Amino acid sequence: MGPLRESKKEQRVQHQEKEISRSRIPRLILRPHRPQQQQQQQNKVSPASESPFSEEESREFNPSSSGRSARTISSNSFCSDDTGCPSSQSVSPVKTPSDTGHSPIGFCPGSDEDFTRKKCRIGMVGEGSIQSARHKKEPKGGIIKPGSEADFSSSSSTGSISAPEVHMSTTGNKRASFSRNRGPHGRSNGASSHKSGSSPPSPREKDLVSMLCRNPLSPSNIHPSYAPSSPSSSNSGSYKGSDCSPVMRRSGRYMSCGENHGVKPPNPEQYLTPLQQKEVTVRHLRTKLKESERRLHERESEIMELKSQLARMREDWIEEECHRVEAQLALKEARKEIKQLKQVIETMRSSLADKDKGIQKYFVDINIQNKKLESLLQSMEMAHNSSLRDELCLDFSFDSPEKSLPLSSTFDKLPDGLSLEEQITEEGADSELLVGDSMAEGTDLLDEMVTATTTESSGLEFVHSTPGPQALKALPLVSHEEGIAVMEQAVQTDVVPFSPAISELIQSVLKLQDYCPTSSASPDESGADSMESFSESISALMLDLTPRSPNSAILLSPVEIPFSKGAMEAHANRLMRELDFAAYTEERLDSVLSLSQGSVVRQYWSSNFLVDLLAVAAPVVPTVLWAFSTQRGGTDPVYNIGALLRGCCVVALHSLRRTAFHMKT
């Protein structure tokens, strides 16, 4: 049979189906003539007990509608998501009753024009109240799309068994779709068509059945125009019903695909099975898990960064703490050093203060020794004057023999004067030893002054004991003849503890001394002369030249010293050897006074020119010798700079510090 004939038969079948049901929406049509015989036969043929399937499947596979029935799948089953899984809200496939005459519910037949205009419409008739209830739940239909897949019952999750269904499309191209049977049995389309033989078919049904029986499993009909639809990827049931004969479809395109009649296709996510929903949920959860893991990794990385930053901050803090502790320790050490330095400074100050005190005490001791030396010199001068006066008294006594008694008394006192001079010499030697002693007490000065006062009083006794007028007459004669230099001494002391008590002591000592009663003059005259001389001696002895400081005094002793020139030089050399006191000589040079007999000339050179020339030119000789010896470049020179300086000091300085005093007569 050619393809043209087959296409004609298909058009007839489609036209009959279109006449039966042109719309998916069920319409109740009252049929007044319904044969009861066919209804009874239908009830006998399809009892619920004979069907191995469920009650719903026995209704769906009723043999009374086998000839002209065409199974349809709701339009919701053809909507799937991007994974190819059908929706979960799809209903199980239902069959449209082929015989409208035997069904109480029918559809209005349409004309051929409606058939050509609406090829995508599929009629569906609900069987009984269950089918009508299903259609009430799904009032809206969709357009059958090409390449539709087999739908699964929503009761597949509960374990119900759905029969294999084959849908024959009424559009221009027919596609065969195989459904998976999740039950233990599978039915073929041929079996259902053979079962429908019990009902008296119409002539059109006979042609359709004969066509299906003729080519149930012929391999010639299964060519590329017949292709099974791809099963669902999410269904885990075994592929049952694959042995059923495929439904023929025509390789063509829809003539009016874009005519949706105002019906919008629903979202594919609304038509997923629970398993597919689980898979989608798992996918979403996996994506969320990945996102949470990514966030977790980010948080962990941030935590690690914060931990590393915290570790760095901790290290920095520890380092700063170490620096701070080191600084504190260094500060403590510095404070300790400062304290030690302060202690050292205090000790140095105390030691310096002690040294200053010692130096001041040393200066005081030096001044005390100076006072002792001054008093010693004065006592020596007084003793020498007394010895000269004793000699004059002796000469005068030899001239007057009647005065033997005073002469004897004078001789008796003369050894005392000589012994006094020896005692003064010994005291000078002792004072030379006491010059280097810096710890001498200040009380020694008072003792020495008392001793000097006693010696002076003894000297004055000799003066008073001698006849005053004769001695005074003889003294200028001798001094004029022999050309003796007369000098007035004035020695200033730095600190002399002068008080009225000392002067009173001296006066009392002098008053106790008796003058000599064996003078040639009368006692009244001698007493008057002695009193005059006593007052003059006291006034000459103690004279205050510094009224600004009442505790310091200058001892001025105008004593006439009749010497010869050689005796004067010998006495000066003896004093220089014993004392070597240059300051005293300088003070003597400053205190030279002019007298009425003549003028005193200050000279720094000696009377002999050769001596002065030798004193100046003597250091030149070792200097020249030293210069030649150093330029000669030989061994060690005979003279060095030390020898030169020593020679200069020995030769020149000793001669220069000796001073001679001449008086023009």
Swiss-Prot record:
Gene Ontology CC annotation, any one: axon cytoplasm
Coiled coil: 275-357
Region listing for Disordered, in residue ranges: 1-271
Sequence positions bearing Phosphoserine: 54, 111, 400, 557
Biased composition regions of type Polar residues, renumbered to the chain: 85-101, 168-180
Subcellular location: Golgi apparatus membrane
Chain segments annotated as transmembrane: 609-629
Biased composition (Low complexity): 35-52, 61-77, 141-162, 225-245
InterPro entries: Syntaphilin/Syntabulin
Alphabetic keyword roster: Coiled coil, Golgi apparatus, Membrane, Phosphoprotein, Transmembrane, Transmembrane helix
Tagged with keyword Signal: no
Membrane topology value: Single-pass membrane protein
One protein family per Pfam: Syntaphilin
Composition skew (Basic and acidic residues), residue ranges: 1-22
Protein name in UniProt: Syntabulin
Organism: Mus musculus (Mouse)
